Structure formats: C-alpha cells, structure tokens
Curated annotation (Swiss-Prot):
It is found in: Cell membrane. Residues 52-61, 131-152, 196-221, 283-300, 421-440 are extracellular. The keyword Magnesium does not apply. Residues 1-10 have a biased composition (Polar residues). GO terms for cellular component: plasma membrane. Keywords: Amino-acid transport, Cell membrane, Membrane, Transmembrane, Transmembrane helix, Transport. Belongs to the amino acid/polyamine transporter 2 family. Amino acid/auxin permease (AAAP) (TC 2.A.18.2) subfamily. It comes from Arabidopsis thaliana. Signal peptide: none annotated. The chain crosses the membrane at residues 32-51, 62-82, 110-130, 153-173, 175-195, 222-242, 262-282, 301-321, 354-374, 375-395, 400-420. One of its GO terms (biological process) is amino acid transport. This is Lysine histidine transporter-like 6. It is a multi-pass membrane protein.
Length: 440
C-alpha cells in the first residue's frame, strides 16, 4: 500500500483493517540494523550451500566472475530499490507492487510485478520446506546413528509443523527475533562449511574439470548453475517491505538507515558467499554435492551443528518471505470478499498457505533443481532487471550515461539468467525426477 502524510479517511479505514507492520501504520520503530538482519535472513539461505556445486559446472574463472558480477549488480539494484521507496515527495511505496503501479501504471503494474514477487516468495517458502526437512534429517542421523531411519517426507512435515505456529505472529516486527537468530545462524553455518572444507583438505585426485556429462546435459546444467547463483540474491523481493518498517523524516528519510543496513547485509553476504564458493570448490572440485554439508563428515558434531543451524535459519527465512504473502492474502479476503479482519481470518489464511507450501515441498524434494528453476524464473526479474527498468522509467537517466549503461547491463544479464536457468532448472527437474520417489 502506498502511504503518505497526512492520511486520508479512506486510507485510515484501510489502515485499521491491516496489520501493524503495513504501510499505513504511523509507528515505524525499526532501526538500521533491523534491515541488516532481515536482508541477511532473506538473502543468505539454502543457496549459499549450493554455490560450490554451481562452481563445478562453471569452473574457476567463469564461476568467480559470475558470482562477483552478480554481487555487484544486485547491490546496485538494491540501492535503486532503497532510493525509489520515497521517490515521490510525501509518499512511501511500501510494497514492490506499489512501486510497480507507479512505474508501469495502475493496471499494468500489478500484472508485471506481483507474479514475479509471488514466485520468489512462494518459491522460497517451498524450497525452505525441503531444505529444513533435509537438514533436520541429516542432523538426527549424525547425532543418533543407531536410531531407526525415518523417511525424508516426515522430516519435512515436522519442519512444516513449526510454521503452523510461527505463522500466527501478527506482523513483520513480531518476527524480528526469529530473523535475528536466523541471520546469526547463516554466518555460523557458512563459516562451518568453508572452515570444515579447509580442515578436510583437498580430496585425493581432486579435479577442477567441468563435470563429466554429455554436451546437451552439460549445457542445461550450466543454465541451472546460473539459477542457483541468482537464488543467492533473493532479498529484493522483500526490500520495500523491510524499508516500510523504518521511520522517515525530512531530516533523515528512511533510505538512510535502510541503506546502512543493506551495506551491512552485503558485507555479511560477501563474507559468507565467496569463502564457501571458492574454498569448498577448492576442497572437493567436481565431486562437490549440491549441498556442500553432505561432503563433510568429520567432526560429526560440527557437521550436525551446521545442519541444525541451517534449520534455524530457514525457519526465519520462511517467515520473512511469507509475511508479505500473508498480508496480501488477508487484505484480499477483507477488501474483495468482505471477510472481517482478525485472529480467525489470520488463522485460516496462514494455515492454508503453510499447508500448501508444505504439500508442494513434500511432493517435489528436488533441492538443487528447485533452486535453479525458481532462481531464474523469479529471482532474476525481481533482483536484476525489474529494478533497473523502473529506474529508467522513473528517474530517466541521460542516454549513454554510466547509469544508463549499468541499468541496461543489469537488464540484459537478468533476462539471460531468467531464460537460461529456467530452461535448465525445468529440464533437470524432469530428468532427475526418475531418480526420486515422491513423498520419499
């Protein structure tokens, strides 16, 4: 919802029907470090553990270049999102869809922005269901080797059960503690991943050649690797919603604390991503797993702790990505269908949504391939070219200026990643589905 000051009577009515974290609430108590750990929680997740696997298909030079280029381009587009939040004096675009309406028009904007944002948010929630269950299973198997093995689908169900409870937290600010814990865990398990790889050392006869597959399969796997890298930069889809929790005054607009938080988040991002991608690939080469923790076996207690940290982190990540979806669903039920806003509506809409993502996650546990598919189809638009397109429309930089060129580079790279990794991810899901048992 677009917020402005003063608030009109119609907007005041809408505000009273909304959650406390939504745009119209005058209380915006978040500090700059809130945006740091919210952004870290949204951005650093399951994707960091698949970066060495992407390196195995891209190689040292191209892989490092793609990772560095992606980091730089998405930092620039994140800066654009922060600046565009209050690009109209007296108005705050508190949601991605609000900015889309302003840039593309009230009719076209939602059709361009909302599907992409929902793909990111719902896609992340599905992937995090799979990741949480998979790592929870790994944790128990390491700590209790004599326990009776339990099917992975049951662990995913157990992980999903946590979200039936946490999803009832009313607003973004109420999940701040969960998000902070998740951000700390991401830094910890990333350190364990690259630190454990150093302690493990290089495997005998390590090879840095491209993974041995037929030419057609290799091409699709490279496409999927691009999607896995783009998945690692998914925070843009909730950037405006995070900034909406920041106070703003003429002397200190919200873009100041938000940008401070983003810089902090990207520093943490670099500290996590580059060591994991490069060191873990150095240790295992083309034999690295799509979840690098699977390659580490010793010390057992440390690997078990890392898996548990991943579980805690994706619990927080799920909530960060789900909260805007909850807001959208509840507003739709109130405004379009006349439901009364309250605890009952919150319980049913959020429970149904969690059950939906849980069902899809249990049915399609293709962790690595899901990363590539959703990474290209959803994250490339929201993180690469949609911010750049909106910047060109709203700010209208001089043609052939540095800003103009940087935006067009982001657009071209983003479109290529979207097409390539979506094709590669879908093809790999189809190919690998024969090796999995549904509800395994």
């Amino acid at each position: 919802m677009v917020s402005s000051s003063p608030v009109s009577p119609s907007k005041e009515t809408d505000r009273k029907s909304g959650e406390k974290w939504t745009a119209e609430d005058p209380s915006r108590p978040a500090k700059w470090w809130y945006s740091t750990f919210h952004t870290v929680t949204a951005m650093i997740g399951a994707g960091v553990l698949s970066l060495p696997y992407a390196m195995a298909y891209l190689g040292w030079g191209p892989g490092t270049f793609v990772l560095a280029m992606t980091w730089g381009l998405t930092l620039n587009t994140m800066w654009q999102m922060v600046q565009l939040h209050e690009c109209v004096p007296g108005t705050r675009f508190d949601r991605y869809i609000d900015l889309g309406r302003y840039a593309f028009g009230p009719k076209l904007g939602p059709w361009i922005v909302l599907p992409q944002q929902l793909i990111v948010q719902v896609g992340c929630n599905i992937v995090y269901m799979v990741t949480g269950g998979k790592c929870l299973k790994q944790f128990v198997e390491i700590t209790c080797s004599t326990c009776t093995p339990v099917r992975q689908s049951y662990w995913i169900l157990g992980f999903g059960g946590v979200h039936f409870i946490l999803s009832q937290l009313p607003n973004f600010n109420s999940v701040a503690g969960v998000s902070l814990a998740a951000a700390v865990m991401s830094l910890c398990y990333s350190t364990i991943a690259w630190g454990g790889s150093i302690a493990h050392g290089r495997v005998p006869d390590v090879s840095y050649d491209y993974k041995a597959t037929n030419p057609g399969d290799f091409t699709f796997r490279v496409f999927n690797a691009l999607g896995q890298i783009s998945f690692a930069f998914a925070g843009h889809a909730v950037a405006l919603e995070i900034q909406a929790t920041m106070p703003s005054t003429p002397e200190r607009p919200s873009k100041v604390p938000m940008w401070q938080g983003v810089i902090g988040a990207y520093v943490v991002n670099a500290v996590c991503y580059f060591p994991v991608a490069l060191i873990c690939y150095w240790a295992f080469g083309q034999d690295v797993d799509d979840n690098v923790l699977m390659n580490l076996q010793r010390p057992a207690w440390l690997i078990a702790a890392a898996n548990l940290m991943v579980v805690v982190h994706v619990i927080g990540s799920y909530q960060v990505f789900a909260m805007p979806v909850f807001d959208l669903l509840e507003r739709m039920m109130v405004n379009k269908f006349g439901f009364k806003h309250g605890v009952v509506l919150r319980f049913f809409t959020r429970t149904i949504y969690v059950a939906f993502t849980l069902f899809i996650g249990v049915s399609f546990p293709f962790f690595g391939d899901l990363l590539g598919f959703f990474g290209g189809f959803g994250f490339a638009p929201t993180s690469f070219f949609l911010p750049s397109i909106m910047w060109l429309i709203i700010k209208k930089p001089r043609r052939f200026s540095v800003t103009w060129f940087v935006n067009w580079i982001s657009i071209i790279v983003g479109v290529f990643i979207m097409l390539a990794s979506t094709i590669g991810g879908l093809r790999n899901i189809i190919a690998d589905s024969s090796t999995y048992s549904f509800y395994a």
